[in-house]
């Protein structure tokens, strides 16, 4: 099975207008990603405010994205839920709609044991034959995969990757030492993208590439072409933007940045609220200094 979990993947924002999905803005955003040759997009993840979507909105968001992209790049759906039956429903619907694969985190809030985490993903794996990426974001979910659980899950044939949002630089090396075969590790933390690539990860799931897809793509291309200095220079240039996009809870800052660039309305759903005036000021200043235009 071809492993598409590699390269630059954008954790896409979900545009809203008047408390509804803004499908016109979605088309513009997706076409910008395709224009800059982003390797794949993640729809309805944390950055995409998945928890605020109704099931009907979730289906509409995926279906519209699949239609717009029209096989021009892979689409990954977010299927995280602390209700295993509902996570399975999301995965099955993703398959029906035509996405290429899906990502899921350990169930949040309920604090399952490692065995419970394994059984959750085993159930997902048995219910839907799409490729699966594990999503490690313990600051959000409250629980994480142990290395041993990752090893067990990697033996299920369609669990092919791990998105690691942490900063433990030893973790990719530990996992690569015990997990054999076609299993990819990607970083989901923009600030440590190069540090993690130096430890053997093969991809980057980025928030920043919503706003600066061209620069993010150039950074990875330079790294993959062994131009370490060139990659470092772009990374240093982007560092203030990485930090600005996490001044407040993601996706609050990136949604404002997208609005400032004319990509969508600055509309975010409760319990999240729009960026503070202080954050807006910093974001505008950094985008202007980088001469980012869409």
Curated annotation (Swiss-Prot):
Positions of the record's site feature: Part of a proton relay during catalysis: 46, 109
A GO CC term assigned to this protein in UniProt: cytoplasm
The protein's enzyme class: lyase
Entry superkingdom: Bacteria
Pathway: Amino-acid biosynthesis; L-lysine biosynthesis via DAP pathway; (S)-tetrahydrodipicolinate from L-aspartate: step 3/4
Keyword ATP-binding: no
InterPro entries: Aldolase_TIM, DapA, DapA-like, Schiff_base-form_aldolases_AS, Schiff_base-form_aldolases_CS
Binding-site residues, pyruvate: 47, 205
Localization, UniProt: Cytoplasm
Active site: 135, 163
PROSITE patterns in alphabetical order: DHDPS_1 (PS00665), DHDPS_2 (PS00666)
Coiled-coil stretches: none
Keyword Amino-acid biosynthesis: yes
Oligomeric and partner information: Homotetramer; dimer of dimers.
Similarity comment: family membership: Belongs to the DapA family.
UniProt cross-references to PANTHER family, sorted A to Z: 4-HYDROXY-2-OXOGLUTARATE ALDOLASE, MITOCHONDRIAL, DIHYDRODIPICOLINATE SYNTHASE
Entry protein name: 4-hydroxy-tetrahydrodipicolinate synthase
Species, as recorded: Rickettsia prowazekii (strain Madrid E)
